[in-house]
Amino acid sequence: MSKEELIEFEGTVVELLPNATFRVKLENDHEIIAHTAGKMRKNRIRVLTGDKVMVEMTPYDLTKGRITYRFK
């Protein structure tokens, strides 16, 4: 899949789930399940409840996403 097809949203982490997975509430009040991107895992960037994050999603499945950035 090319990068142009991805949709990006900002959201807030609501709940921590097992296996580096998170429940994220998006700005449009939808809740999705998201996991951290590989570069975030590699650089050991911690994501905690209440953090504001950038989530990218595929247009084919709008219930799952990937956390690509944690805002400071």
Swiss-Prot record:
Name of protein: Translation initiation factor IF-1
One Pfam family cited in the UniProt record for this chain: eIF-1a
CDD domains: S1_IF1
Main location: cytoplasm
Assembly notes: Component of the 30S ribosomal translation pre-initiation complex which assembles on the 30S ribosome in the order IF-2 and IF-3, IF-1 and N-formylmethionyl-tRNA(fMet); mRNA recruitment can occur at any time during PIC assembly.
Reported function: One of the essential components for the initiation of protein synthesis. Stabilizes the binding of IF-2 and IF-3 on the 30S subunit to which N-formylmethionyl-tRNA(fMet) subsequently binds. Helps modulate mRNA selection, yielding the 30S pre-initiation complex (PIC). Upon addition of the 50S ribosomal subunit IF-1, IF-2 and IF-3 are released leaving the mature 70S translation initiation complex.
Disulphide bonds in the chain: none
Organism of origin: Hyphomonas neptunium (strain ATCC 15444)
Cytoplasm keyword on record: yes
UniProt cross-references to Gene3D superfamilies, sorted A to Z: Nucleic acid-binding proteins
Gene name per UniProt: infA
Top-rank lineage group of the source organism: Bacteria
Entry keyword Cytoplasm: yes
PANTHER family on file: TRANSLATION INITIATION FACTOR IF-1, CHLOROPLASTIC
Subcellular location as annotated: Cytoplasm
NCBIfam families hit by this protein: infA
